[in-house]
Amino acid sequence: MSTATAAPTISTVGELRAAGHEAKPLRIEIRDNLLARLRAGEDPWPGLHGYEDTVIPQVERALLAGHDIVLLGERGQGKTRLLRTIAGLLDEWTPVIEGSELAEHPFEPITHASRRRAEAEGDSLRISWMHRDERYVEKLATPDTSVADLIGDVDPMKVAEGRSLGDPETIHFGLIPRSHRGIVAINELPDLAERIQVAMLNVMEERDIQIRGYVLRLPLDVLVLASANPEDYTNRGRIITPLKDRFGAEIRTHYPQELEAEVAVTRQEAHLVAEVPDHLLEILARFTRNLRASSSVDQRSGVSARFTIAGAETVAASALHRAARQDEGEAVARIVDLEAAVEVLGGKIEFESGEEGREQEVLTHLLRTAVADTVRHLLRGIDLGPLVAAIEDGAEVATGEQVTARDVLDALPALGEAQVYEELFDRLGATSDGERAAAAELALEGLYLARKVGKDSAGGETVYGQ
């Protein structure tokens, strides 16, 4: 949520008129704020990476056109985050009739109760101020979502008080009417039952509410946003065609197309309890991208960005665990910590039916490919020949859960006048013992994958040697 400034002090309709306030339709409000930010050179979409040239321009055009929007994409593509960011285009504070059920504008009451109050109290009608964070409402669609949840129902308590069933004031409004003058976002839209989709259809197109056989016309001012899986959002899927037709913009999302964007998302979203060097984040990002390209993985389910994020958090936790057990002053993740991530992340991937029993083999192969690609990318031009020669002469370097960064560095063989280590550490920006040990492990693992050195793993310890 955004950091709020203090709300205005105006407290009555009369004061609001005197201040020159004008009521503005929701879509005009969003359009004006978006245009103002674009003209000022500001970024209306903070924290979104990889959509700058694809999704965001489409969203901006849809908002300028005043369209309801549905985002189509696989899981973990940032659809929900993008929907939430749209709320940042609302005015920070907006006036509402104090105590009004539907956050009505003081100049434009729409319910019978608010109209009566406005007529009776005139300029002395009390107002309050609503922050934009309160004007965004989100609902995860599930098959058991009811019309009462989204649209409303008759309130039996009000009927018991003596009001008739046809009295509009007997209605307990649902999520969409309560989002009047705001944004309602529905995730996984096709999961709604067909009768709920029909009810939404009336609200979006006709702006009327049908409850228990009678119709209440309300000039609702709501921007409807939704997300859906592309497979479900078709005439053959679980979406009714008339509702599909009501969304002015269907926008396809995607996973980050550039490696740098994938790393940036992970760095931004992961809650890391220890330092994770950039080269490890790159490995995890490449690992995720390899999974998305693998024929062994069910691509209909996708490989979420949350996979990379969870991997980074697990790697950091492994480093912190080692630092605590070995009484290290700093916790820095190394190549050895990737094994812990693979062990716990496999369950997040759905494999094709013919891959039963090969899941771990596939994960290990794709991770090694990611490491090799990262080594080629980051260490290109560094001559590791002296290190290979030292290992061929019998040197060994041990690492593992029980091995500290200092132990790894002490085990590195002396290379005479060769500046291999200095060049390696400088290339990766490694200054502390932990960062240097992580850099050394990356180089050793790269040499192993290139079949320049050997590697033996047993009992929680890995030894690089002949």
Regions found by a protein language model. Give the residues of each.
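Canonical AAA+ ATPase core
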Residues: 90-128, 132-175, 180-273, 317-326
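Dynamic helix-loop-helix/coil hinge segments at AAA+ ATPase domain boundaries and subdomain interfaces
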Residues: 17-25, 36-55
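Conserved glycine(s) of the Walker
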Residues: 78-79
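Short hydrophobic/aromatic beta-strand immediately N-terminal to the Walker A/P-loop
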Residues: 69-72, 185
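Conserved C-terminal "switch" segment of AAA+ ATPases
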Residues: 5-10, 19-33, 233-238, 244-301, ...
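Phosphate-binding P-loop
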Residues: 51-52, 60-66, 74-75, 176-179, ...
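C-terminal engagement/docking regions of AAA+ P-loop ATPases
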Residues: 300, 320-466
